[in-house]
């Protein structure tokens, strides 16, 4: 099948922002102008096309990232809508993995807010080229220039305006295109009619100042242009665009545009910039991975290369069942064909292929290199798996997901729904790698764990709506962990020899604290323990580590070296070695100076100045460490690290202390040792 658009005319972009910066409205407008929707959906009326789960429409926030295809000026644009609420940063992480470029949306009044910083850092991690769109130019307190300065100060971004606004707040009329040196004024409400005019006389000087700053920033990226500029020659629009595109793709410059999506101003110009400056799949480096022998390998964006695709999100659709949102990096994926899930080493059949327009879908015969779509009919594939051709397998770099920090006990309102709830929770955990569910061995309760209170509220909500399971939910608990502080050597010996067949397993391990994940190293020499019993020892240790010895919390950040052991020709079995492994682990834990770790949250509280003292005192009383303070838009911002256990119910307390004027955001930062007195309290509560 011939391509409708050549690869250089593809743009796979994400729209990322702080909650409420107007990201979904912006996406809506893009869909409207690119002809995908005939009626504009307003978020505050609860009808936005991208927000397709009922909870999103009620809360006016975006939770799942839907991939939508639209067309603009002979380009195919795939938009991945990412949530801005901090409990859903995992959605942002996974969408950034499959994007080539991103538009960061900022609120002209708030500028760079805490979540914008988080999302920006995530984009840095994946080297995603970005442009910025400063939205809400029509609201009270909008300040374009302050927002640009905040991008420079707080994000260390080389932010360069390529447009400046004409007027602001109620008088926001349009913008000045600094590259073409002309004014664009909107003459109707839908923003479909606009006039290109001369720059208003009272703005000529300002436009000149910003235009020369922009040209200086751009020529710095290109030696040839620099020489031309220094010799006083005129630099053409084409030259500016070419140099700017190169700079954006190399992550050296961030062009800044402005507008008001709600008032339909500036969106088309922002789309022009997406097409003009953000990379196509050909502009980014080949995707990296490993072949079946573990050697480094890569795939270029080319239809003739072997197939390599990444399933970046699993969603359950009420009509077609499981949808796997996938990006094809190389080769062609055909409906009805077989592929290899190289992460799991299993064959999968591609049922149907669909391109999504938020929640209508269009069936296609194939997805080519650089395209995004969803696969219907995969059985085994989960988030982060690689799909590749059977005769040329590759495993693309895996995605990393943080561990949950908060958990609650949950039970169905009727005994009859117990099984239904179990199935539903398993489905939800398959969709969302940061959501975990397990049964507490001591109490028999079902526990759900996630990234924050909102995250779990939405899970419970979905259980009721999508799976029709009514639940009772306990009080949120902190997901504590246990770890060790010193290296030790210990053994576990399991011997049972009382008539009939006995049991014999014996393992000697060295256990050391580490910063990273659990590691197991087999250092047995001379066959002291036969090969087939090594894995059972590892399994025994891993199972035992799920329930630590201080207060039964999972043990993390340690590594094990199996150094010795012994076996019995007749009595040894896998089971016996598994038990020996878990005994060795427990013996090692008691000697290794174990401690409890608690999640520490990065908290930002924004309050009017008069409440500053009171709020700082309150943060300190919650065992908080204040990291810094700054003034922002007439309010004081306090930045601190506070243990999660002290933050439950903080929203209510902050509201009452500040008469509803204070706001805060928090997100998980790291785990830290619990002070002795608190540790004793935790142990007491568990007993």
UniProtKB/Swiss-Prot annotation:
Keywords: Cytoplasm, Elongation factor, GTP-binding, Nucleotide-binding, Protein biosynthesis
GO molecular function terms attached to this record: GTP binding; GTPase activity; translation elongation factor activity
Superkingdom of origin organism: Bacteria
Database matches in Pfam families: EF-G_D2, EFG_C, EFG_III, EFG_IV, GTP_EFTU
Sequence ranges assigned to domain tr-type G in this UniProt record: 8-282
CDD domains to which the protein is assigned, alphabetical: EF-G, EFG_III, EFG_mtEFG1_IV, EFG_mtEFG_C, EFG_mtEFG_II
Matching SMART domains: EFG_C (SM00838), EFG_IV (SM00889)
Gene Ontology cellular component list: cytoplasm
Keyword Transcription regulation: no
Signal peptide as annotated in the record: none
Disulfide pattern: none
Alphabetical list of Gene3D superfamilies matching this protein: 3.30.230.10, 3.30.70.240, Elongation Factor G (Translational Gtpase), domain 3, P-loop containing nucleotide triphosphate hydrolases, Translation factors
Stated family: Belongs to the TRAFAC class translation factor GTPase superfamily. Classic translation factor GTPase family. EF-G/EF-2 subfamily.
General function of this protein: Catalyzes the GTP-dependent ribosomal translocation step during translation elongation. During this step, the ribosome changes from the pre-translocational (PRE) to the post-translocational (POST) state as the newly formed A-site-bound peptidyl-tRNA and P-site-bound deacylated tRNA move to the P and E sites, respectively. Catalyzes the coordinated movement of the two tRNA molecules, the mRNA and conformational changes in the ribosome.
PANTHER family according to UniProt: RIBOSOME-RELEASING FACTOR 2, MITOCHONDRIAL (PTHR43261:SF1), TRANSLATION ELONGATION FACTOR G-RELATED (PTHR43261)
Name of protein: Elongation factor G
